Each structure stands twice: as C-alpha cells, then as structure tokens.
Amino acid sequence: MDYEDNLEAPVWDELNHEGDKTQSLVSNSIESIGQISTNEERKDNELLETTASFADKIDLDSAPEWKDPGLSVAGNPQLEEHDNSKADDLINSLAPEQDPIADLKNSTTQFIATRESGGALFTGNANSPLVFDDTIYDANTSPNTSKSISGRRSGKPRILFDSARAQRNSKRNHSLKAKRTTASDDTIKTPFTDPLKKAEKENEFVEEPLDDRNERRENNEGKFTASVEKNILEQVDRPLYNLPQTGANISSPAEVEENSEKFGKTKIGSKVPPTEKAVAFKVEVKDPVKVGELTSIHVEYTVISESSLLELKYAQVSRRYRDFRWLYRQLQNNHWGKVIPPPPEKQSVGSFKENFIENRRFQMESMLKKICQDPVLQKDKDFLLFLTSDDFSSESKKRAFLTGSGAINDSNDLSEVRISEIQLLGAEDAAEVLKNGGIDAESHKGFMSISFSSLPKYNEADEFFIEKKQKIDELEDNLKKLSKSLEMVDTSRNTLAASTEEFSSMVETLASLNVSEPNSELLNNFADVHKSIKSSLERSSLQETLTMGVMLDDYIRSLASVKAIFNQRSKLGYFLVVIENDMNKKHSQLGKLGQNIHSEKFREMRKEFQTLERRYNLTKKQWQAVGDKIKDEFQGFSTDKIREFRNGMEISLEAAIESQKECIELWETFYQTNL
C-alpha cells in the first residue's frame, strides 16, 4: 500500500501479507473501527500528519515480524489448530469463500471500468471505490484461478467512504479548477463596460458641502453659468439612447453635419446630384408704374437681378404681367413633369388698386426667387432671356414660335397645358404633323367620323396618379374655403377698426363740451387709446393679409401647377392612345394589301405605318419619363409646402401676439395715468 495516497489509513492495514483471507478479515475490522472513530480522526489532524510522516520514513515491508515468546503457538499443535479453526470461522462468517467478482480479478480479458474524472460517483472522487490487490492486474495470473461471476461475493473491499481524503481531494481539485478558470478568464476575457451605467455614473449627483459649493459659485460664477447653458444645449441635442458605434458605421461630427446639410438642401426624390448646388442669385421686383393710354394702359415692374450666370453679372429690365405668364409657359414646356413656380392669377377688376398692385408685385417677386433657388430652372435659356433682354417683346415671340409652347398672349388657367409637337417628335416630324392638323387630326376628320365612331379615350392605369389627383382636388377646395374665411375675418377686423374710429370721434366730441377740465382730459385720453387700437387693428389686418393671405394664395396657385403636370401626363397618354389607334388602322389596311406587296400603295402604307410606330415609341418614352418625374417632384413639393405653411402660421401667430400686447400696454398706461 502506498501511504502517500491515503495518509489517514491505519498503519497495520497492509502488515499482514500471509493470505487473502486474513487480509480481508483485517480490512473489514479496520472498516468497522474506522467508522466508529471517524469523528476522532477529524479532530486529531496533527496526530495523523505525524503518523504519516513517520510511516514515510520507515519501510514497513522490510521490518521484521514481532513475536511474543509467551503467546507463541508455533510449538503447540493444539493451540495452533484451535487458533486456525477460529480464524477460519470468523473469516467465513464475515467474508464467504465464493467471490462473485473473482473472474473479474483473475481474468486477463475482462477489466473493471471506472468513471472518468468528469462525473465521480462518490463525493467527487474520480477513483473506483472498490480497490483490489495487485493480482487483479497481474498479467501472469492463471486463467484457471478465475471463478464464476455468478457465484457468491468474496474479496477484500476497502473503505468505501473515506470522508477526510475525499474532502482533501475535492478541495484540492476545486482550488486547481478555480486557478485555471481565473487564469483563462484573465487571458481571454476583456473588461466589460456598460454604456448605460457609465452614462448614469457621469450624470450622477454627488453631494458636496455647502461651503465648498458657495466658494466655487463665488469664484467661478461666469464659468458655472456658461457650463450650465452648454449642458442644457447638449442635453437637448443628445439622443435618447447612446448606442455603441461599430467599425464602418462610425462617422465624425463634421461628416454628420455635412450629410445633414446635403439632405436638407437636396429635395427628396430629386434627380439633381447632391453635389450640384444653386448658384447665388439676387432678384428684386419693385417700382410698379402705370404705362400707356386708356386703351393700352398697364403696369410695368422693374426687375433687378445679380448673378454670375448673367453675362454682365447685373441686369435691370422692365416687365409687365403677361411677360411673367410667358416665362411660366416656357419653363413648363421646357421641363415636363416639373412643378414650375406659378405667377399670380389674371384679374381684370380692380387691377389698378394700390393694395392689388402691391400684392401682385410681392407674388411675382416670390415666383422669381423660387426659380432662382432651383439649380435646374435658374440655368434655363428662357429665364436668362427674361432677366436680360432689352427687346423682350420680339424675342419672346421668336422663342415661343421656335419651341411651339403657345406662350404668347396666354390667358388660360394655370393648370391647363399644351404639349409641343416640336418638343415631342422633333422639328421635321412636328412640321408634318402640324401641317396635317396635329396628332389627333385623324380622329376629328369630318362629321361622320365624330357621329358614328367613338373618340379614343385615355384611362389612367397607375393608382398613384388617380389617388394623388383626388387628394389635390380636395386640398385645393379646402384651401379656397380657408382663404374665403380669412377674407371674412379681415373684413370684420376692418369693420371693427372703422367702428372704433367712429367711437373715438364721438368721445372727442363729448370731451369738447368742457363740462370740467378733469373730465375733458380723461375723455380725450380715452379717445386717443381707441385711435391707437384702431391703428393696431389695421396693421394686424395688413400683416395677416401679407402672411396668411399671400401664403394661401401661393399654395392654391402651386396646386394648379401640380395639376398641370398631371395634365401633361394625361395629354401624353391621350396622344399615345390616338397614335396606337392609327397604327391599328394602318396595320389592318396593310393586311388587306398583303397580296400586292410590290405595289406603290403598299409601300406608301408601310412607310406611314413605320412613321406611326416611331411616333408611338417616342410618345411612350416621354409618357413614362414624365410619370417618373412627377412621382419625384410630388414628394419634394409636399415637403416644401408643409414647411412654408408652418412658417406662415408662426409669423401670423407672432403678429397676433404682438398686437394683443400692444393693446394691453395701451390700456395699462391709460389706467395708471388717469384712474
């Protein structure tokens, strides 16, 4: 036995090497004694360690066997026989001779499998609780000595539950595992930091003594105020959650700011590249002047513009209202599917009143400014011609004729459009089409064709355009109602101002009677307050007209421009249906002339069919391009108009608040000085 494996085992456990039977008896006796003295052995650890160290120094296997001469039975046969019989009886009672696991001990082909070190059966011990002598694993053991496995059990089992050793081994294994775990954690794991807990710790309130706080506040009062303001601004701009940034998603604050500026300046859905920006442009419309005699009287406005796009960097010209309408139609013809800033509506009655002229001047200036802010429209040839031409009357007619826009003397509604055949088919083919009366000339030939054949009709297939057009009609109707309500409010406010003025004059008349000097002074001051209120009402009425009224009017006219681009798509769709109808007719005629392929009539008919096919392809291409352009423009238009409407509401609200504050101050001053 190796005493280093089990230091607490009895010293005499392995001294008897005479036979297996005696050894089994002694081991069983030791087991019973060990169970009785377990508690004493736990308490006396120092004695056991001393015994273990003593056992290590002495070789028990080579020690001579001690014999008592008085008790020796070697020379007495009776005592020796009696002693042997007693020992046999005791061994047979405690350990039968038949060993059920003898075959396992003596067989060279069978072995006992023990549990691996991962799941110990008893108290975490990895070794088998049944330990046999060395003959089990002796390769020279004879197979004849093996017995049947099914026989009765015999042998010399050792102590099954060695609690002291198990505890010592378990503690040692646990400490080794703990050391390995900590070592692996130190080498593999990295320290984890919770961003939310870190933010809470940064914002955590730390109590400080009042004296120190007062001293800091007195010494650094300016710095403290600045830091508080900075912290408030940072908290306002700070996101709700601080998400950790990873790898490619990390961007510097400068890049974020640059991207936000690009997003804000670039219209949503616009096909203009984000890097392209509008060139700086200054436009001003001022100095309206009445020109002409009774039959040709009109108002001319001075248009001043400054930009690097102009040939001379500066231009000053005079333009009338119809010139602004010409510009609108030309831009509409040059840029299909794009929302063009509209001019004011044509109005014949009251066109020479002062308020009307000022309102129209403001609207035309707003139109030019919006065109200048668009990077595409500001570079248009017709727009630059409008700003710089000194002989605009003749040059505008030439441009309208060359482009086929029909912009001269236009008096139609802003939502009505005209599709230029020159812009659609090209100059050569358009000349032939116009010579024959237009694209839809075939559908209007003669009275009989109108009576007995149905005209081709275009039906919109895309739900987007149907839905958006319906919403635009509803929005336009509601805005017109709101504009009328605003006019009623303005009229009522002007009526209130007139009534206030009349009341003030009556109070002044009453004060002129001079019943008493204090009374007259009080009444005169009272009348002055009402005059000031009357002036405030007139100013607020004018302010609301110039903000909400102009904004609503511009919104309604812009919706007319949006309806115009929808009508452009419908017009192109109508031309597409007409050309397709003509193609079908020509195709049927070619089918009838199929037998006369070499005839002159067949060749002429086939040439006409090829021309119609080319027109059909061009029209379909333009129809699809306009549809895509409208979808992009509509989203950007909605965003811009929402922003403009909100700004107009804010300005109107601020003006109303200032007007009410002025009235309150007037009444407070009157009360403090006179009452």
UniProtKB/Swiss-Prot annotation:
Residues 279-394 form the PX domain. One of its GO terms (biological process) is endocytic recycling. The keyword Protein biosynthesis does not apply. PROSITE patterns: PX. Keywords: Cytoplasm, Endosome, Golgi apparatus, Membrane, Phosphoprotein, Protein transport, Transport. This is Vacuolar protein sorting-associated protein 5. It is a peripheral membrane protein. GO terms for molecular function: phosphatidylinositol binding; phosphatidylinositol-3-phosphate binding. The gene is VPS5. Phosphorylated on serine residue(s). A 1,2-diacyl-sn-glycero-3-phospho-(1D-myo-inositol-3-phosphate) binds at R320, K346, R360. SMART domains: PX (SM00312). It is found in: Cytoplasm; Golgi apparatus membrane; Endosome membrane. Plays a role in vesicular protein sorting. Required for retention of late Golgi membrane proteins and vacuolar biogenesis. Component of the membrane-associated retromer complex which is essential in endosome-to-Golgi retrograde transport. The VPS5-VPS17 subcomplex may assemble onto the membrane to promote vesicle formation. Belongs to the sorting nexin family. One of its GO terms (cellular component) is retromer complex. It comes from Saccharomyces cerevisiae (strain ATCC 204508 / S288c). The PX domain binds phosphatidylinositol 3-phosphate which is necessary for peripheral membrane localization. Residues 195-204 have a biased composition (Basic and acidic residues). Present with 6120 molecules/cell in log phase SD medium. Its main location: cytoplasm. InterPro entries: AH/BAR_dom_sf (IPR027267), BAR_Vps5 (IPR035803), PX_dom (IPR001683), PX_dom_sf (IPR036871), PX_Vps5 (IPR037868), Vps5_C (IPR015404). Residues 168-180 have a biased composition (Basic residues).
